[in-house]
Amino acid sequence: MAKLLQQPPKFLRAEWQIANKNQYHRAEAQRSRSERLVAESQRLVDEIEKTTRKSQSDVNKKLEQRLEEVRFWKKELDDKLEQLVYATEDLLLYQTRLQKALESFKEPLHITEKCLEYREKRVGIDLVHDEVEQELIKEHEIIRGVMTLLTRTLEETCEQIRLNRSAKYNLEKDLRDKFTAITIDDICFSLNNNSPNIKYSENVVRVEPNSVSLEDWLDFSNTNVEKADKQRNNSLTLKALVDRILFQTASDLRRQCDVVDTAFKNGLKETKDARDKLALHLDKVMEEIASQEKNIVVLEKAILDQEGPAKVAHTRLETRTHRPNVELCRDVAQYRLIKEVDEITHNVARLKETLAQAHVELKGLNRRQLALQEEIQIKENTIYIDEVLCVPMRKSIPPRDGDDHGEWAGGSHPEAVC
């Protein structure tokens, strides 16, 4: 108990002074450290504030640059999309032209086939593989070749339109994405420290797994632009090709059409000349038939006319056989009567022979008449087929090129016919 009530030990004055000095020094040191910390803190605050302002300014600048870059590419894509849309619209018109041109060649093909079919109805010697038939066959081959070429070109045009639409889809998708990106970056660029809708978000400092590098981003848009340019250039090339094909095919058909029509004209002239010559020969044969018929009448009359003298001579000879006795003499009169009978018999034989020949010739002339009439009919049939059935039907050739400008393929007017 005595120890508990014992007063604490007292320090020496020197110890007291040392203890106070230690407190002074520690307080001074603590204050000094605190002042330095305050100064350092202010410097740090100023530095960080400056750095933050600089970073935010740099971010704003980067956002602005990014906006300019995205807007630049958006404009590029817009321009390419507009060009591609125009090119596709043109190709759709060319597609329609090709379809109409292909359709328009069906009638000329039908006409050519009908002409060949009609000309198969020529008969006899006129069923000849003449120049008209050769040129019609060539025209048929040209039209078939043209239709094959137009069909193939139409397929190429449809495929090019499909490729254009694919490129257009990629451009539109890229444009939508860029529009969204511009909208987002515009919002980000407009934000400041006093914006009401700023807030903390969790886990924002990360790299999205589906994000791409700037090089990939540039390559993506550049690839879309290059593809659009390629398809547009292909479209322009195809348009020029279609123009050439439509012009050349129409020109080829028109030229062959002219050749065929010239062949028809020459063939008709030749056939009509042959018919006229046959008709001339028929007239001469008819005249000769009439002459021969008259000749036969004359010969028959001449034979008939010999009957009287023959009967007289025979009667005289028979009567003179009744002379009596020595009067039955072979005198000059007897010999002359015998000679007369022989002459008449011989002459009648000659007349009958000539009459027989005349009948033979008349039959020959009649056969020739029938042959000439049949041949003339054959020629008339050929002329009818070519002049009445074929030539008028061909006036609707050549076909239109499928354009809506009222012109024929190749640029000639619709009333122009081959």
Curated annotation (Swiss-Prot):
Residues 399-418 are annotated as: Disordered. InterPro entries: Tektin-like (IPR048256), Tektins (IPR000435). Residues 21-84, 268-308, 336-383 form a coiled coil. The keyword Repeat does not apply. The keyword Coiled coil applies. Microtubule inner protein component of sperm flagellar doublet microtubules. Microtubule inner protein (MIP) part of the dynein-decorated doublet microtubules (DMTs) in cilia and flagellar axoneme. Forms filamentous polymers in the walls of ciliary and flagellar microtubules. This is Tektin-1. It comes from Bos taurus (Bovine). The gene is TEKT1.
